[in-house]
Amino acid sequence: MEDVELTLTPDDYSLLTDLYQLTMAACYVGENIDQRRASFEITVRRLPPRCGYLIAMGLAQALDYLEKLRFSSAQVEALQSIGIFDHALAQFWTLLREAQFSGDVWAVPEGTAIFANEPLLRIEAPLWQAQLVETYLLNTLNYQTLVATRSARMRDVAGADATLLEFGTRRAFSPQGALWAARAALAAGLDATSNVLAAVKLGRKPSGTMAHALVMALSATEGTEAEAFTAFHRYFPGAPLLIDTYDTIAAAHALSDQIKAGNLQLSAVRIDSGDLGSLSRQVRAILPGVAIIASGDLDEWKIAELKAAGACIDGYGIGTQLVTGSPVNGIYKLVEIDDIPVMKESPGKITYPGRKQIFRRVENGIVQRDRLSLIHETPDHEQPLMQLVFKQGQRMQESDSLSTIAERTRASVASLPPSVRDINQPESIPLDLSDHLSALIEKTRRKTAES
């Protein structure tokens, strides 16, 4: 097969979907229901293991996708050439050529803590449009919510004063995923990313240290580890140095001697291997005025262990465990069509009918419970979480800044009870179903059984 360019651009958005979204759209056209008003909601049935909450993230990219979704003539011709749509009506091709998202979008703001069975986002649009966008929306919301949740948990465990650096680009699932991961991490409270492209695009200063390769290469060619450090500081004065290539403690002593002699200014050292707790305490005694950064497959549990063991660590470089991990299995399900509520009743995969709102009860700054209600219901000393962000295909407002989202994340996590923030055996916030929603569930079940 001939090699082709597979780098994603906004021009590709229309075809970045599963085939069945297009075949269903063609069927809707044939059955003359493609323009029926449909509502789909994204929810998560179950939280990932040992996770008491999720941090919603990815809305900005979802709205960007909806704004730019178009089919080019070449893309329509490509679909026509594959032989799958030979029986599709001519109106289907006209629909694609003129495609532009014209619906409404309701969503919880990025950085908001949410729980199982609560909608992150709702699409209200002509049926064929609402169907088509499922794949991309789940892709961006699921992944960024995963990274944001892990970032928020690590920040919660490490504390507000710790420096947290996103180092996950090499372990992310794709170059695009690496950019989304960097954004989600920064928006959920991490201090910086090593991903240069992400940092530049997001208006942030990238952060990083050095790799063992530089120490080994310069040690081999210039004589010693100390000379490798001197060479690096010649171009990046005071920059953090990686000191565990050969002997962490010996390197720390050598640097201490240079500092005492007035020959060196040093902002930080990084330790990437060994017993991080023990090594950090020894290095702190040798270099008391130098920040210590730890890295090496760290996650919230390892950070908690290090803190409990009295490790002298000022910052953490977090990579693999941040950008991978247990997936967020968000689902995108039809809840209403032409004002007719619908629900799925498969065992273990039940969905709730109707367009819904989340009402959150907060007392003395702490979340007490959530209530899942229908959109016509009103709050009872509660906060409505879902907001109208897109109306008739147009944004209602500009996307929030990363700093705004990061502050929302911080406040949202701080409002959760300690039992929900626990990283080992977390509880979840109680979710009540309103009387109106409960009645609608029973009514929809009876109607389904009768039909």
Role assignments for model-derived ranges:
Residues T209, A213-V367:
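Glycine-rich phosphate/ribose-binding loops and adjacent secondary-structure elements
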